[in-house]
Swiss-Prot record:
Membrane topology value: Multi-pass membrane protein
Record family assignment: Belongs to the G-protein coupled receptor 1 family.
Database matches in PANTHER family: B2 BRADYKININ RECEPTOR/ANGIOTENSIN II RECEPTOR, MELATONIN-RELATED RECEPTOR
Molecular functions per Gene Ontology: melatonin receptor activity
Subunit structure: Homodimer, and heterodimer with MTNR1A and MTNR1B. Interacts with KAT5. Interacts with RTN4 isoform A/NOGO-A. Interacts with TGFBR1.
A Pfam family it matches: 7tm_1
Protein name: Melatonin-related receptor
Keywords from the UniProt entry: Cell membrane, G-protein coupled receptor, Membrane, Receptor, Synapse, Transducer, Transmembrane, Transmembrane helix
The protein's role, per its UniProt record: G protein-coupled receptor that plays a role in numerous physiological processes including regulation of energy metabolism, neurite outgrowth or cell migration. Promotes self-renewal and neuronal differentiation of neural progenitor cells through activation of the NOTCH and WNT/beta-catenin signaling pathways. Modulates the KAT5-dependent glucocorticoid receptor signaling by modulating KAT5 subcellular compartmentalisation.
Length: 119
């Protein structure tokens, strides 16, 4: 997304210092993402699988929040990025050489890729 839609800023954004900042932000967000599991749910041991797991089944609000954060939000972000890339690619193409049948095929291919990503 950054390379295609923001190509002029791409090299400036991926300097070593900025890359380190992006890595730190990613790790901080990951830790913040796990913290609700520690404070809201309970950690239980499953002797059948010899593992510990977070038990938050009795809290439906927490379950809905987790689904929104872990599924809906990434889906919206990826959908936005794919749409912006698609718009950029279509805008940069030569409109004189386009065939209406090709446009329909391109839309169908884009939607197929997006649905496959969803699955």
């Amino acid at each position: 997304y950054c390379y295609i839609c923001h190509s002029l800023q791409y090299n400036a954004d991926l300097q070593p210092a900025n890359t380190c900042i992006y890595l730190v932000v990613t790790w901080v967000m990951t830790v913040l993402d796990v913290l609700p599991n520690v404070y809201i749910g309970t950690i239980e041991y499953d002797p059948r699988t010899y593992t510990c797991y977070f038990n938050y089944v009795n809290n439906p609000a927490f379950t809905v929040t987790i689904v929104c954060i872990h599924f809906v939000l990434p889906l919206i972000i990826v959908g936005y990025c794919y749409t912006k890339i698609w718009i950029k690619v279509l805008a940069d193409r030569d409109p004189a050489g386009q065939n209406p049948d090709n446009q329909f095929a391109e839309v169908r291919n884009f939607l197929t890729m997006f649905v496959i990503f969803l699955l």
